[in-house]
Swiss-Prot record:
It comes from Pleuronectes platessa. Pfam families: UDPGT (PF00201). Keywords: Endoplasmic reticulum, Glycoprotein, Glycosyltransferase, Membrane, Microsome, Transferase, Transmembrane, Transmembrane helix. This is UDP-glucuronosyltransferase. The gene is ugt3. Gene3D superfamilies: Glycogen Phosphorylase B. The lineage of its organism: Eukaryota, Metazoa, Chordata, Craniata, Vertebrata.
Amino acid sequence: LVPESSLFMHQSEDYETEVYPVSFTTEEMDATHKQLKDGLFLKQPDWTEYYVNIMRFVNFTSIHLRGCENLLENQPLMSRMRGMGFDIVLTDPFFPCGALVGNIFSIPVVNFLRGLPCGLDMKVNKCPSPPSYIPVPYSGNTNIMTFPQRVINMAMTVVESYQCSLLYGHYDEMVSKYVGNNMDYRTLLSHGALWLIRNEFTLDWPRPLLPNMVLIGGINCAEKKKNASLPADLEEFVQGSGDDGFIIFTLGSMLPDMPQEKAQHFLDAFRQIPQRVVWRYAGDPPKGLPKNVRLMKWLPQKELLAHPKAKLFLTHGGSHSVYEGICNAVPMLMFPLFAEQGDNGLRMVTRGAAETLNIYDVTSDNLLAALNKILKNKSYKEKITEMSQIHHDRPVAPLDLAIFWTEFVIRHKGASHLRVAAHELNWIQYHSLDVFGFILLILLTVLWVTLKCCLFCTRRCCRRGTAKTKSE
């Protein structure tokens, strides 16, 4: 299902698509997207803008919720789909459309995702997340924390709960409208049959998982080939780099360009290195383009990373790009912009396979220093090669694993046997507070009885002593 107005979703010859009308235009979507990304190159976000950024995100998601309503209110399309007898809904739970369709059609839902804001994917699955060693997103902590860091991490769990209520309040309204029974988005998501999570522990910190959560990090990777299939002119350009090799630079599909002043900082640094640079840049070409830099509105990222002459990957740190870098053992210089990208950068830096720079204060000098540091220090290549070997050393490839479990849910019409009983417990029962209370009551009762017995015995002894004294 594809909305007729979309920035990134389009029809494809590889599968059948159904385009449904929506009440907004692509221009409106582009405007909300622009509002979300404006300012990324200007200054570092601070705590004073925390609420403002959340509201921008809410505005960004609101237009997609309108699209969900347009789909659910399209009775001819919904009736036709119901009659087609679908076996499963495969959806990204970032928006509620897929989960709502699955509930309305009474068919299993398989969620396909990297993660949800404020860790909602873990919360709705009742997956244990002890703050003592699992860092809260955006906290800047690793899985090994000092006492002050654990205090901050614990405090941020409270902030995270507040963030959840802001982000998903309008989701709850939509779920209540179309499902009823006072159901909220958390409850709806908790009935998902399976969760295909685009992550795994080569990149992520070790943590508990539940049986209905399957890690498929690297599903988008292409196997590294000695002769990557590149267009002839691009192959000639990268081969011309000689032993120095070339650099791939892209900030993802959401940011195809940047302010001219910022672009000049990159060009000033690139002209001082011997490597050639392939840069995905869809804006107006910057002035004074060096001979070793080639701009492309679109570039074959997988094939370039798989090329034997690829030396460095300049990326925003999105999970797809990071895993493609890991799969092909290419060190990274990361410019985290939003979402999980900062945490991805922290993980890669901690593992010694990357460095990070802030896009808003990058200059030609600090960029050149970072480029030379990674290109001239062999440890980055050694670390990313080790990560790549670990990532590939698995019994089942991520794509095959995702296919198996999706077909499993289809064959068995769900996976209810993987759903933990924690969903049936309230907060007090889940944390065994009623058990602790019962044990405490028993202990207090025993203590009270013991105390009463001691007092009784003491009084009896005192009375006997008094009677004996009087008789004497």
